[in-house]
Amino acid sequence: MYNKLQYISQGKTIEEQLLNIRKALENGCQWIQMRFKDTHSDNVFTLAEAVKRMCQEYTATFIINDNVYLAKKINADGVHLGLNDMNIAEARTILGEAKIIGGTANTFEEVLQRTAENCNYIGLGPFQFTATKEKLSPVLGLEGYHLIIQQMKTKKNKIPIYAIGGIQLENVDDIMKTGIYGIAVSGLITQSENPFQLITQLNKKL
């Protein structure tokens, strides 16, 4: 099954991205989602090639946010697709059955939709306010996660659900009690002054 901790990369330049990704990898994170927006496609390709090599060095899973064709071109482990990105069926045709395709959801109905579309895991959020995303869906909180997980149980839906959006270390125990499978974090790791201690604690809690 998939690692329960996913780091979504941050950084406005290739150098910043690589620094942050290496920080996550060398301190124990085994799953990287590369997210590099608002830049030239050549920069995204250059970064993706470098991150792939880095993830191979640490035997970590490497997926790319949004860019199915790039994931195919460099043979990444998969992609993560938002609700307004390429549809999952089309991505599956391009990437094949063996690749990981994650999908975003904000409601139980969207979880069912993503499951029917045959994605491998769902990023469900946001948990709370986050500055990482400009257009934020309605915040779910612990109550929202608990409700959606209970609804999934009644439907016998076992797709892995990752909590995402503004998660802090002190939230993790309560989030996991809702029945969530794992967490995806960005700023929490990027901004950490002691990433080894943080990631070790996160991996223990998960």
Swiss-Prot record:
Cofactor remark: Binds 1 Mg(2+) ion per subunit.
Residues the entry annotates as binding 4-amino-2-methyl-5-(diphosphooxymethyl)pyrimidine: Q33, M34, R35, F36, K37, N65, T104, K133
GO molecular function, one term: magnesium ion binding
Positions that bind 2-[(2R,5Z)-2-carboxy-4-methylthiazol-5(2H)-ylidene]ethyl phosphate: T130, A131, T132, G166
Keyword Magnesium applies: yes
Keywords, sorted A to Z: Magnesium, Metal-binding, Thiamine biosynthesis, Transferase
Cofactor list: Mg(2+)
Record-level GO cellular component terms: cytoplasm
Coiled-coil ranges (or none): none
Residues that, per the record, bind Mg(2+): D66, D85
Pathway: Cofactor biosynthesis; thiamine diphosphate biosynthesis; thiamine phosphate from 4-amino-2-methyl-5-diphosphomethylpyrimidine and 4-methyl-5-(2-phosphoethyl)-thiazole: step 1/1
Family to which this protein belongs: Belongs to the thiamine-phosphate synthase family.
Alphabetized HAMAP family for the sequence: TMP_synthase
The protein's role, per its UniProt record: Condenses 4-methyl-5-(beta-hydroxyethyl)thiazole monophosphate (THZ-P) and 2-methyl-4-amino-5-hydroxymethyl pyrimidine pyrophosphate (HMP-PP) to form thiamine monophosphate (TMP).
Stated name of the protein: Thiamine-phosphate synthase
Source organism of the structure: Flavobacterium psychrophilum (strain ATCC 49511 / DSM 21280 / CIP 103535 / JIP02/86)
Underlying gene: thiE
